[in-house]
Amino acid sequence: MSVNSKLYEGKAKILYTTDDPEVLLADFKDDATAFNAQKRGSIQGKGKINCSISSQLFKQLEAYGIKTHFIDSPTPNQMLVKAVKILPLEVVIRNIAAGSLCQQTGLPVGTILKQPLVEFYYKNDHLGDPLLTRDRLYLLELATAEQVDAITHLALQINEFLNKFWQQCGITLVDFKLEFGLDSQQQLLLADEISPDTCRLWDTTEEDSNRRIMDKDRFRRDLGNVEDAYQEVLQRVLKAVETTN
């Protein structure tokens, strides 16, 4: 399969068209951003690590019955994906209070939620990716009520699977972001990536509130050892996959 032209460049990936209109090539970058790209940097090897982690998790989710855009990973930092029209929504699933949830509600960091919280954010950097109510979501016509219900159901299914998987890795899944898209048949697919860039991950065996962090919060908060943390997550994922298979 040949790669044609650049279709889109985002913060973490570049998308290219291929000779198949139904297939795109995603090239994962080492670039790192935080706070809606107000903070920028680079994490050495991040592209390869995130592509590898995402590929493994997409395969596991497909086997679990979740339809994703994943096709194959021809190189360590590249992924062949089904072409989808991304819904302009960031779907955040929270199991433990952290980040903006604590800032906006006053909940102490680390509070275990009685049930997973599913939130929708408007995928719009110019507006700062604001939290949406369902009524606002419908007002902006970002998705239909049927799509929102389907996404919520899928998000909870994905959370149930990933919670168990990360536990096998000795990692606590605090919260994470998902994106969904529609293929040419209007089928809803899980898209984007699942990685330390999009998940808040804590080392289950580490009690120190800083040392336990294994995700992009290390970059956001200048905690150091970002590359080592990402690499450790990858190694644990590969070990868990090997054990599962």
Swiss-Prot record:
Listed GO MF terms = ATP binding; phosphoribosylaminoimidazolesuccinocarboxamide synthase activity
**According to its UniProt record, in which pathway does this protein act?**
Purine metabolism; IMP biosynthesis via de novo pathway; 5-amino-1-(5-phospho-D-ribosyl)imidazole-4-carboxamide from 5-amino-1-(5-phospho-D-ribosyl)imidazole-4-carboxylate: step 1/2
What does the entry give for GO biological process? 'de novo' IMP biosynthetic process; cobalamin biosynthetic process
Print the keywords alphabetically.
Answer: ATP-binding, Ligase, Nucleotide-binding, Purine biosynthesis
- Per the record, the coiled-coil ranges are none
Q: Name one Pfam family in it.
A: SAICAR_synt
What reaction does this catalyse? 5-amino-1-(5-phospho-D-ribosyl)imidazole-4-carboxylate + L-aspartate + ATP = (2S)-2-[5-amino-1-(5-phospho-beta-D-ribosyl)imidazole-4-carboxamido]succinate + ADP + phosphate + 2 H(+)
Q: Which PROSITE patterns does the annotation name?
A: SAICAR_SYNTHETASE_1, SAICAR_SYNTHETASE_2
Q: What is its EC number?
A: 6.3.2.6
Q: Which NCBIfam families did the record assign?
A: purC (TIGR00081)
Question: What family, per the record?
Answer: Belongs to the SAICAR synthetase family.
What is the name of the protein in this document?
Answer: Phosphoribosylaminoimidazole-succinocarboxamide synthase
